């Protein structure tokens, strides 16, 4: 969370294997609501990373308690360590995220909204209209029909079903597809910003 330091290696490995990787960050907002921030390039992602770092509490990571925050290269080898603790909330309000991420040519949407912790619903009870999100992420456990019934603000948003996996073995098998004019980060970001019409099934 709150870091893009492994984006470059991940994008490089993706290119090597014929995969389109979209660099991004799972931001923890001031409200403790996790938010996905995606960018067209690693350079944009790293500029945003620096902004978030400058607007986060300066606190050293306790590796014994929270684990080592390892930076990897594209050969899956450790090349460094982030010493600033990354799990804390950044001093960035949820109402400001979309406009801020747009400044770095990206798109943002609330993460795992159906989870009982660190989601916009668990912390705020609803998605603030001022936040101007065009999409939202739900987990594979979510009852989409129930969510749409209970939260009217979701009915005009793209709902992306993801695993919220922190380990490879927890990643879902693909069960949905997104029809984009081009298989590029730029095209996905345009769709998530509501700039082009898409089909998501």
Residue locations for each model-derived region?
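Short low-complexity stretches enriched in small and charged residues
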Residues: 59-68, 88-95, 112-118, 133
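Charged catalytic cores and adjacent phosphate/nucleic-acid-binding surfaces used
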Residues: 4-46, 99, 104-107, 113-201
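Active-site gating loops and adjacent loop-to-helix segments of metal-dependent hydrolytic enzymes
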Residues: 39-83, 126
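Internal catalytic-core helix/loop-beta-alpha segment
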Residues: 78, 82-114
